[in-house]
A protein has these predicted regions:
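Arg/Lys-rich amphipathic alpha helix in sigma70-family domain 2
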Residues: 56-63, 73-93, 109, 161, ...
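Amphipathic, Lys/Arg- and hydrophobic-enriched alpha-helical face
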Residues: 22-40, 57, 120, 169-172
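A short, charge-rich alpha-helical start-of-domain segment used by transcription regulators
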Residues: 7-31
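Sigma70-family region 2
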Residues: 11-12, 38, 49-66, 85-87
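DNA-recognition helix of helix-turn-helix
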Residues: 76, 80, 136, 148-172
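Acidic, proline/glycine-rich intrinsically disordered inter-domain spacer in sigma factors
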Residues: 90, 97-121
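Structural recognition of an alpha-helix C-terminal capping motif at a helix-to-coil junction
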Residues: 31, 45-52, 65-77
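Helix-turn-helix DNA-binding module
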Residues: 1, 118-121, 125-129, 133-154, ...
């Protein structure tokens, strides 16, 4: 059974087909969610939220792109919404609690792997997402443009800028 037939069966209410569709795509959805969020628990939540959204909107899937591309666009949206929510909550620290926030001195330079992870985390959301989708997940610029709803040229320039920022932040490791 091909993926279109599987999707049609899920829309018709076939729970086994839904489980098959989930089992087929969940590992890559989780992988992308983990790379974008950097946290296993958040990645599990994002994976769950992604499939809840996908199954509730499955009838809206037109098939213009691959089903996995459509799912990954949902992952990006869910992670982005979660990050915005976290930032909003972080800003809402009460003034009387603000005095208890301590500043710590940066530790000695960790190894390269930790520095790379930190440098990627420091990228803007748009740059980080584009970098992960292209360099780690292996999507083409056209697929990323479709997922993010931006022109292909924007994806290319974001990737170039992300790589330039990483080179700058990791220059200390260059010999």
């Amino acid at each position: 059974m091909n993926e279109r037939q599987l999707i049609a069966r899920v829309i018709a209410g076939d729970r086994l087909a839904g489980r098959t569709l989930y089992d087929t795509h969940a590992p890559r959805v989780y992988s992308l969610a983990y790379r974008l969020s950097g946290d296993a628990e958040k990645a599990r939540e994002v994976t769950q939220d992604t499939f809840i959204r996908a199954f509730s909107r499955l009838a809206q899937f037109r098939g213009d792109a691959a089903f996995s591309t459509w799912l990954h666009r949902i992952v990006v949206t869910v992670v982005s919404n979660a990050r915005r929510s976290e930032v909003r909550i972080a800003r809402e620290v009460a003034l009387d609690e603000a005095h208890s926030i301590e500043m710590t001195a940066p530790e000695a330079e960790p190894d390269l792997k930790e520095s790379i992870a930190r440098a990627v985390d420091n990228l803007s959301e748009a740059y980080r997402t584009t970098l992960i989708l292209h360099d780690i997940e292996g999507y083409t610029h056209a697929e990323i443009a479709s997922m993010l709803g931006v022109p292909e040229g924007t994806c290319k320039s974001r990737l170039s800028a992300a790589r330039a920022q990483l080179r700058e932040q990791l220059a200390a490791f260059k010999e």
